[in-house]
Amino acid sequence: MNPYRRATLLCSVGLGTTLTFASSHWLLAWMGLEINTLAITPLMAQHHHPRAVEATTKYFLTQATAAAMILFASTTNAWMTGEWSINDLSNPIASTMFMAALALKIGLAPMHFWMPEVLQGLDLLTGLILSTWQKLAPLALIIQTAQTIDPLLLTLLGISSTLVGGWGGLNQTQLRKILAYSSIAHMGWMIIVIQYAPQLTLIALGTYIIMTSAAFLTLKMSLTTKISTLATTWSKSPILTSTTALVLLSLGGLPPLTGFMPKWLILQELTKQDLPIIATAMALTALISLYFYLRLLYAMTLTISPNMINSTTPWRTQTTQTSLPLALFTTAALGLLPMAPAILMLTT
């Protein structure tokens, strides 16, 4: 793609998200979401591969459906209450429809069906944008309207997302699909606590973006998209393979890595809200997700591909291309847990 076109589309993606952030009127928020969708679509189909075109079509259809539901919900709320403000979502039918539309936009279960298939058809950098930046605008709207949405609906969406995110990743061999189910599970953790402590949702979102960015960038640098090729990476770049393994464990929420911090804080908040059953259910679903991350770690470190000619690491490995964003994201994805009290203090 022409660099000028790519820059224009990336600026439009940022403009759509910023417009949604800054809007207090439903039509402006809807317009920002639409600019975002229309700008990301050419980036998804830029390689003209049949899988990429198929993924782009699926993404466009689901996002268009969600946008129509948002427009219908906002019109219904304005008709029933006379208010177009985002903070005045008082009609229960409109609020439920609005939450369903945003759940479809960010891939919450049971509206998650498009996420793994779309991510599988994209390259790793576009998949990174889809998994991180594209979640910001819908989550901002959910945070603004969380107090008007039925708590039972949010709880069901949160638990089902963490369950589906863990269960769906068990049988996968493609790393992009595994990261898609990881995204679904992390969205569930954010939604479950959004009514009680929105600042914890922001902490979980920040750590999710850091860990997912580190995971996508390490996989891109090692040119790995399948579990079967993970076994060959250690002989090419042992340091990068070790980094990838630690980042995946951080995504799974294993202490003492960064990914444990949001889960620990969210479970603590749910316990404070006298919701021990929900906290226990969330902790158990996190174990399912941790299992398939450990499976990736096993394939990466303890297995050898039958196609390998040399079974030992050469004494001199090729120098990997340095990447400043990868170094920053990886460092943050592995070492932020000791700073948890300071981060919590800054957000409250």
Curated annotation (Swiss-Prot):
The similarity annotation says: Belongs to the complex I subunit 2 family.
Q: Which organism is it from?
A: Cyprinus carpio (Common carp)
Keywords, comma-separated and alphabetical:
Electron transport, Membrane, Mitochondrion, Mitochondrion inner membrane, NAD, Respiratory chain, Translocase, Transmembrane, Transmembrane helix, Transport, Ubiquinone
Which Pfam families does the record cross-reference, listed alphabetically?
Answer: NADH_dehy_S2_C (PF06444), Proton_antipo_M (PF00361)
State which residue ranges cross the membrane.
Answer: 13-33, 60-80, 93-113, 149-169, 178-197, 202-219, 246-266, 274-294, 326-346
Which enzyme class, named as a word? translocase
Its localization reads: Mitochondrion inner membrane
The EC number(s) attached to this protein equal 7.1.1.2
The Gene Ontology terms for molecular function here are:
NADH dehydrogenase (ubiquinone) activity
Gene Ontology CC terms, in alphabetical order: mitochondrial inner membrane
Please verify whether the record's keywords include Lipid metabolism. Answer: no
> Quick check: keyword Iron in the entry?
no
Q: What is this protein called?
A: NADH-ubiquinone oxidoreductase chain 2
Q: Which domain of life is it from?
A: Eukaryota
- Provide the reaction this enzyme catalyses: a ubiquinone + NADH + 5 H(+)(in) = a ubiquinol + NAD(+) + 4 H(+)(out)
Q: What does this protein do?
A: Core subunit of the mitochondrial membrane respiratory chain NADH dehydrogenase (Complex I) that is believed to belong to the minimal assembly required for catalysis. Complex I functions in the transfer of electrons from NADH to the respiratory chain. The immediate electron acceptor for the enzyme is believed to be ubiquinone.
User: How is this protein situated with respect to the membrane?
Assistant: Multi-pass membrane protein
Entry's Gene Ontology BP terms: mitochondrial electron transport, NADH to ubiquinone
